[in-house]
Amino acid sequence: MNGTVNSEDLKGKVVLINIFATWCGPCQSELAEVQKTLWPKYKDNKDFCMLVIGREHTDNQLTEYNKRKGFTFPLYPDPKREVTGKFASQYIPRSYLIDKDGKVISATVGYKKEEMDKLMKEIDKALK
C-alpha cells in the first residue's frame, strides 16, 4: 500500500512494528485502538515510525481492507511471510517496539486494551 521500507529510513527512530491479519479478531480490536489513540498522538513525530504488516496479505487485499476500516496509517503487505515468518510465525497480533538504537524494548503477543496505555508510555519514554 505504501511501497517498501528500507532499514536506513528507520535508523535513529523509535519504531513500532505490528503484525496482523484481516481475519484475526484481536488484531481488529488492536488496530481500531491504534487508529483511535496511538496513531493521532505520534503520526507527526519525525522520530517515530509505525509499520503495520499484514501477514499473508497482498497489497490489493490490504487496500480493500483499509477501504472498509478507514485506517489513516499505512499498511504493508507480506504475502509470502518474508518478514512475518521470522517474527510472528504463529500467534498474532504481535507488536515490537524498537528504540532509537535499534534495540527491542517491548514485545507483545495478543491484545488487551489496557496494554495500549502501557505501550504509549513506553513510546513516550523512548522518544525522550
Task: Name every feature range the model reports, one short phrase each.
Residues 1-15:
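A short beta-strand-turn-helix
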Residues 6, 20, 51:
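Conserved Rossmann-like nucleotide-binding pocket used by diverse enzymes
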Residues 13-14, 29-53, 67:
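Conserved helix-turn-beta segment immediately C-terminal to the redox Cys motif
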Residues 13-15, 20-23, 91:
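Short pre-active-site segment immediately N-terminal to redox-active cysteine/selenocysteine motifs
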Residues 21-26, 56-60, 81-83:
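Solvent-exposed loop/turn segments at secondary-structure junctions
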Residues 46-59, 71-80:
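Thiol-based oxidoreductase modules, predominantly thioredoxin-like and allied folds used
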Residues 64-71, 78-124:
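Thiol/disulfide oxidoreductase modules built on the thioredoxin-like
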